[in-house]
């Protein structure tokens, strides 16, 4: 699988290194993404590329290879869905580590001070969830389509995909 994995690892590492450089260039104590576009870009490099990789690996099965082009329409969104949910779920831990994946456009909209992220009002918490959940739900819908395209007789692969999907959906 090296011929599948290696170029995608390079793509992912290259994208993540750009984000690391953006943080290094920032003078802020907490590095924050500017907008939803930057968040989607980040999610692509850390998770969307994994969706591409898994599809290429899964497609080594003759049963799945027949659906490959249709799966490829949804594979990036699979990763984005899971990562968006992680961003929503883990934002306080991320901020403690000096990263804020909740875009500046969202924190400004709800007058959120990153230094007091642990003391958000219910309205501020709901605002974060609402603004990030809209794209996340779209990505989750696409993920469900991806799973439905997997042949029924590929039960292990289907379960491999269903379990994180259900966990993300239930979060």
Mark where each language-model region is:
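Short, solvent-exposed helix-loop connector elements
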Residues: 146-159
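Acidic catalytic motifs of isoprenoid enzymes
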Residues: 1-149
């Amino acid at each position: 699988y090296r011929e599948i994995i290696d170029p995608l690892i390079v793509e992912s590492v290259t994208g993540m290194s750009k984000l690391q450089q953006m943080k290094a260039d920032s003078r802020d104590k907490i590095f924050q993404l500017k907008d939803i576009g930057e968040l989607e870009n980040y999610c692509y490099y850390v998770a969307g590329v994994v969706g591409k990789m898994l599809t290429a690996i899964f497609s080594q099965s003759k049963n799945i290879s027949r659906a490959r082009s249709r799966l490829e329409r949804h594979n990036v969104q699979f990763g984005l869905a899971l990562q968006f949910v992680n961003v929503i779920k883990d934002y306080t831990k991320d901020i403690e580590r000096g990263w804020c994946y909740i875009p500046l456009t969202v924190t400004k909209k709800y007058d959120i001070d990153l230094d007091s992220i642990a003391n958000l009002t219910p309205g501020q918490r709901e605002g974060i969830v609402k603004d990030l959940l809209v794209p996340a739900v779209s990505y989750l819908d696409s993920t469900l389509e991806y799973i439905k395209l997997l042949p029924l007789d590929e039960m292990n692969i289907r379960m491999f995909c269903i379990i994180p999907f259900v966990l993300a959906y239930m979060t």
